[in-house]
Amino acid sequence: MKHVFIVNKISGKHKAYNIIGLIKDVSEAKHLDYEIKVTEYKNHAKEIAESYFYDDDVTLYSVGGDGTLLEIVNGMNLQTPLGVIPAGSGNDFFRFFDGNAKRDLRKIINDTIDAIPKDIDIGVCGDMRFVNTTSIGLDAIINANASRLIRNTFITKGPAYLISIIENSIALRTTHVRLFADDKEIEGDYYIIACMNGKYYGNGVMAAPSASLSDGYFDLCLFKKANRLKTYSLLLKYLKGKHEGVDGIDIIRCKHVIIDTDKMVDCQSDGENYCSEHIDISICEKALKLKIPF
């Protein structure tokens, strides 16, 4: 068995690149047949993952954040076991297993290598796989606007997201949608529509407190339009994961979601931005063999 660590060298302010020595120490202490691949450009992690096949007898490891994991999941053969070493800025997927995602990295690496793979669900949106979430609304707009600021100005990631959060929290734009959640049809104006496989997204927002990665269902969060005072109150609950059963935010368990809008809107899947007016999302039950260190 070969262990291949795919490292995003810029992830987490170079945190992933800086733990290469730690990966080597643990791997050599275990006498592993291992290889470290460092990404050089966007989608390089996907290309690296695509180069391995199930009969290669290999385990892949995502060393970075949610974006690195997204690339690998979209490139890999799903019969290949995958481990996640949280070395990004958000690590929202890993928070499902460790709420603060701040455990000792040496122990995480060691325990992930030793872990027996477990089958978990993933989502598919169009031709993109995702492990955590696909959403439209304020969260996707904030993500897209921050990314544009980073790309087109000298503003760095932290301030860019802060500016985008402030601007869009004041504007409070809604999106009019017609959606189907399995056989249920819904139409209305919403601030956020988040189709959750995991619990967390957006750097620690617990949108789906009761989500499971192996129940064969999404938790579809629908944040309805309301007056400004109520919206801010609900938003605080939403950010802290205290919104289950609260009037104004519905959570529907479903396997298939279709969302139609009357114009192109910002969307995101595990932090990857795009625009669409038609989104078709399906659950793929127990599709990914994940090595979980706990």
Task: Locate the predicted segments by residue.
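Short Gly/Thr/Asp-enriched flexible loops that form oxyanion-binding sites at enzyme active sites
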Residues: 68-80
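Glycine-rich beta-strand-to-loop/alpha-helix junction loops that act as flexible
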Residues: 9, 63-65, 85-88
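ATP/NTP phosphate-donor binding region
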Residues: 1-60, 184
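Gly/Ser/Thr-rich active-site loops/lids in small-molecule metabolic enzymes
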Residues: 150-160, 209-229
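ATP/nucleoside-binding phosphotransfer catalytic cores, i.e., glycine-rich phosphate-binding loops
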Residues: 16, 181-182, 187, 212, ...
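Glycine-rich phosphate/pyrophosphate-binding beta-alpha loops
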Residues: 135, 139, 194-208, 273
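Catalytic core of DAGKc-family lipid kinases
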Residues: 30, 39, 78-81, 87-191
